[in-house]
């Protein structure tokens, strides 16, 4: 949304950005934070640069879209000639039995950068050498298709360099994934014996979660984790549905 606002403003258009948060943590490079290669604060950005560029920033949440009007959470409305929706994602906590927002505080998704990113990093740091990390990767569609496999590489790097007796199991609800050949080559060359990828055809689809025991259930059995990273199914943010 911010990039679109900048590009349109550069063409001389009057642009208003509606955004409830005064700052945000960027997802790109957040996997490096999880692996201890980047500081969390480096991911934090404010909207001050947009304001300095002359873009009007309205610190509210948009809740409805009407013909030529956007309705805000406080009841105010903004008129528009052209409307761009940048809804982001909504995590579907109703899609995986046993995995809700409370469970995410034990088995973080870290698919929205910020506190969840820091939580997953702390859990990896606290895990004993020889522990097992289990990732659950959803079926398509979801934000950033290669992201889980990039994360697998970086977690494996952390384990290889800090906790070499540990392993990572990737439970995947797909048989094919983005940039698969490149990732598999990297796993074989850089992290042999560390990453075990379980595809859909091998029983990789996670069907349930138990936060109390950090256990993930698949159609073929269960996996007990010392650290569990559960990436749930997703959909477009609520404003997309509200807009019709």
Give the role of each language-model region.
Residues 9-10, 126-129, 222-224:
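Flexible, charged surface loops at secondary-structure boundaries
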Residues 32-36, 102, 186-188:
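Short, hinge-like loop/turn segments at secondary-structure boundaries
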Residues 1-56, 139-181:
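Beta1-alpha1 glycine-rich phosphate/pyrophosphate-binding loop at the start
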Residues 53-71, 78, 157-244:
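A Rossmann-like FAD-binding core segment of flavoenzymes
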Residues 87-162:
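Glycine-rich dinucleotide-binding loop and its adjacent helix/turn
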Residues 51-98, 131:
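A conserved beta-strand/loop capping segment in the N-terminal third of enzymes
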Residues 83, 87-115, 218-244:
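Glycine-rich beta-alpha-beta "Rossmann" dinucleotide-binding loop(s) and their flanking helix/strand
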